Amino acid sequence: MTLKFKAYYRNPAVWIDTGFLKPIMQKRTFLSVVTAAAALSVVPAWANQHPKRTLIVGMDATYPPFGSQDSETRQYVGYDVDIIRAIGKAEGFDVEVRNLAFDGLIPALKTGNIDIAINDITISPERAKSVDFSNRYYIAGLGIVVNADNTTITKAEDLEGKRLAVSIGSTGEAAARKVKNAEVRVFNQLTECYLELRNRGVDAVLNDIPTNDYYVVTAGHGKVKALPVALTREDLGIAVKKGNKELLKRINRGLATIKQNGEFAKIFEKWFGRQPETELLSD
């Protein structure tokens, strides 16, 4: 069956070339990890009865511009980092970021080793069976990266019969496997996908638009380009343990506060070079 995508055109983003500091890994689906056990041993401070609590935040810090570690300071930086710190400030709690593998985030939430997960996570009905999500804080989607001199792929339909690179277990892999007659090549890391594209071993990479854009600008060296069309439209949310209504309430309240006072828009423009969509601010 031919894969049919709705085309959602995105606004161009202006990027600051800070260097592609860490390998990017595309967000992976949670379906295979729901029953996995977390390996952490420290109970989050959220459970302690202190006047000012510390929110333990889990993220895979290999997803610039959402989250990464500065190569010099070793501090966590990115859109997700700034958003959760701003929410913490609005709600009066401290934030401690812990770097976990993406596929360990849901298990860590379920066992209480982290309080929230913020990691370019798409809100979906399947994931909502395991965790509760905040209101959206970013509108994303899957995009396409091709070599700069490629003129044969300009839209979703052009992917038919092509060689497509995706990272294992990702939403990009799921989409690629629906493309008619496509040869899907699966890699452990997203950076391997981009390298294979530049070596002309594949025709295109399917991956999230923000990380596509970041790679093209900071590490593509003019040899690749991101197409100005999205294959899907996805809302990103902050995940909390299923049933933790009090924490979810505070996260949503803090998110609403920073959207209203202008801090959200300031952070958004810092990392994406443009103002957030009006519909994103209206939630």
Task: Identify the meaning behind each predicted range.
Residues 27-31:
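N-terminal export leaders
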Residues 81-90, 150, 157, 163, ...:
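Extended ligand-binding regions for polar small-molecule ligands
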Residues 171-185, 223-226, 255-283:
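Ligand-binding clefts/hinges and TM-proximal coupling segments of bilobed small-molecule sensing domains
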